[in-house]
Amino acid sequence: YIYFLGENQAHLASVYFSLHDPHCFDARVGVPSHPLSRLIQDLKHLPGVTKYALLNSRFHPPQNTLDAHRIDAVLDTLETLVQAGCLQGIVYVDHYLLRALSDRNPDLCARLQAVPGVNCLLDSLPRIAHHLECLEQTAFKAPEKIVLDRSLNRDRKALDRIASQSRQLWPNMHLGLLANEGCLPHCPFKLAHDSSIALGRMDPAQEQTRAMNTSLGCARSFVHDPSLLLRSPFLRPEDIHAYAPSIQHIKLSGRTRGARIMRRVIDHYIHRAYSGNLLELMDTQELLADRFVISNQDLPSDFGQRTMNCALACYACSYCRDLAKRHVQDKGVRIKPMWA
């Protein structure tokens, strides 16, 4: 996988990786652990790519953020990565953690960007501005890029307005969108879902995120109303070009699905085309790819154009519901996904 990324460095704005630290979590479960030496060895194969460590759990237990020894252990790992030339910044969601790191080693933090994670839900200029203002109270450098909230994938007017104002206020900061996390529109489960992941990272024996999603959460909603699969604010490979120049990069998710599948996801977005079950391209919706099929190549050619400025006002529109009747196939039984 790392050699594949190296061959495609020209297409990469940045890469993200977990520290696999027991006191500082990322926002994913089920990611295989790698020793720091192996991580550095792999990252050195990407010399021209900006590298960010994921410290983006929704929250951390107070005993981690208030304990100087535990914070120092995290900082030691960051220092090792910086010295190896393999780290330019961190991705965070928990501001308590950000301040704890900055207070303990401001000199190190002054060499690192602090990038608000996509789960900070940056959907407006005031929200962006206040996050950056809070960041200014730490030693960290301002981010060179941020990823905006998923809702803006389907609200082009708001996106263009934010992009225009951001260029005036922060001319050196690039904007991006998360392309392939196919969750519910303005997902009501989002904060609880993130918190469930955080709790599972603190105590892996209590990890129940997938069971919660399938029995009580978003996966259950998709089964109840399959039109939500199309109403989800994803960006297809064929449609991302239309978002320039408001954004300068896209983020692709799915680390827990493994390197083989991530290679395919990245390749389809590089080539701006995909033929197959749309759900297999998506992170989250892939849970349902063994039951539902949406042939991406059969969707209307203007699907992206029709949905990029709908503002997710599904209460006043039937476009995706009508499409779902023709394009969402419910097999009714579990089948093995093509990418399994």
Tell where the protein language model's regions lie, with residue ranges.
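Active-site pocket-lining/capping segments in soluble small-molecule metabolic enzymes
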Residues: 1-131, 142-251, 255-340
